[in-house]
Amino acid sequence: MGCTLSAEDKAAVERSKMIDRNLREDGEKAAKEVKLLLLGAGESGKSTIVKQMKIIHEDGYSEDECKQYKVVVYSNTIQSIIAIIRAMGRLKIDFGEAARADDARQLFVLAGSAEEGVMTSELAGVIKRLWRDGGVQACFSRSREYQLNDSASYYLNDLDRISQTNYIPTQQDVLRTRVKTTGIVETHFTFKELYFKMFDVGGQRSERKKWIHCFEGVTAIIFCVALSDYDLVLAEDEEMNRMHESMKLFDSICNNKWFTDTSIILFLNKKDLFEEKIKRSPLTICYPEYTGSNTYEEAAAYIQCQFEDLNRRKDTKEVYTHFTCATDTKNVQFVFDAVTDVIIKNNLKECGLY
């Protein structure tokens, strides 16, 4: 009879080959689809990272899209100057010039026009005079004692440009805008032959209950921490230090049983703000046991250790840490390139292709 196969056996062999081929194709397809979850406390820079993905991987914001951000730029600018003026009352700081009190009253009267995306020359003049005032600057230098947008000085220092009638926000202006994320924002893009699905979820405590259904099938978690938050308290709980809240949250994510096989990427963000702040605000505000110097390198390395030490599975799970400045496109591009290489390697391993 020899080794000839019956028609039935041949069909079985073909079926087996087809199953193997399908399994491999499914594995390759899974390896090519990447689900990224962006987590972190409120105002840690998650949404800015998402905006950078659009700039880096999707040709950025069109002129029409930029125009839509004009109202947000104006709103952020006015919210910032109003926050400073209100804090002056609480901190008992007087205006450098008495006439500025009239400007402050005018500010509250005129502020409404900016909500429609219009900044009148009268309103711009009022804000400029207030921002130049010695008392306002003294209050701004104490911004850790109240809630203020990171982008406050960026917009207020550039009022001449942003108050022009023909003003169109730049990509950088868009990156600097702050809108509280509610719910889940999903972004898709392709990079290095991978199809990315990135989910940005609100960081405030009230938003966290919405995270849970995003967790299934996650390839990697990018956890954002604002380094510059070490001397600040939460917007939603003024008793809680923001860095301590971040550590608590990172601990619960990093050691969660659902994420045993999920890559954890730690973005220690706002390194530019941290570098400036550490010169005048000691790290002991957050970590009383810290005995090192208040230099960027030593203080940043200490914070990195505090987070990495929370990983209770060091022997089997690695935390990939990067120092980032989410508003710097080149920095984010460089870091995300390195992150993608780690994801490719880990993803292929999981699918048995590496």
UniProtKB/Swiss-Prot annotation:
Effect of residue 48 to N: Fails to bind GTP. Prevents endothelin-mediated activation of GNAQ. Results in increased frequency of developmental defects compared to wild-type when ectopically expressed in Xenopus laevis embryos
Keywords assigned: Cell cycle, Cell division, Cell membrane, Cytoplasm, Cytoskeleton, GTP-binding, Lipoprotein, Magnesium, Membrane, Metal-binding, Myristate, Nucleotide-binding, Palmitate, Transducer
Result when mutating residue 215 to A: Abolishes binding to NUCB1. Dramatically decreases binding to CCDC88A. Does not affect GTP-binding activity but increases the basal exchange rate
An annotated Gene Ontology molecular function: GTPase activity
Result after altering residue 203 to A: Reduces cell migration by 50% and increases mitosis six-fold
Positions where lipid (S-palmitoyl cysteine) attaches: 3
Region called G3 motif, residue ranges: 196-205
Residues involved in Mg(2+) binding: 47, 181
Taxonomic superkingdom: Eukaryota
Location of the protein in the cell: Cytoplasm; Cell membrane; Cytoplasm, Cytoskeleton, Microtubule organizing center, Centrosome
Mutagenesis / variant outcome for changing residue 258 to F: No effect on interaction with NUCB1
UniProt GO cellular component terms: centrosome; cytoplasm; endoplasmic reticulum membrane; Golgi apparatus; Golgi membrane; heterotrimeric G-protein complex; midbody; plasma membrane
Similarity field: Belongs to the G-alpha family. G(i/o/t/z) subfamily.
Function per UniProt: Heterotrimeric guanine nucleotide-binding proteins (G proteins) function as transducers downstream of G protein-coupled receptors (GPCRs) in numerous signaling cascades. The alpha chain contains the guanine nucleotide binding site and alternates between an active, GTP-bound state and an inactive, GDP-bound state. Signaling by an activated GPCR promotes GDP release and GTP binding. The alpha subunit has a low GTPase activity that converts bound GTP to GDP, thereby terminating the signal. Both GDP release and GTP hydrolysis are modulated by numerous regulatory proteins.
Protein name per Swiss-Prot or TrEMBL: Guanine nucleotide-binding protein G(i) subunit alpha-3
Species annotation: Rattus norvegicus (Rat)
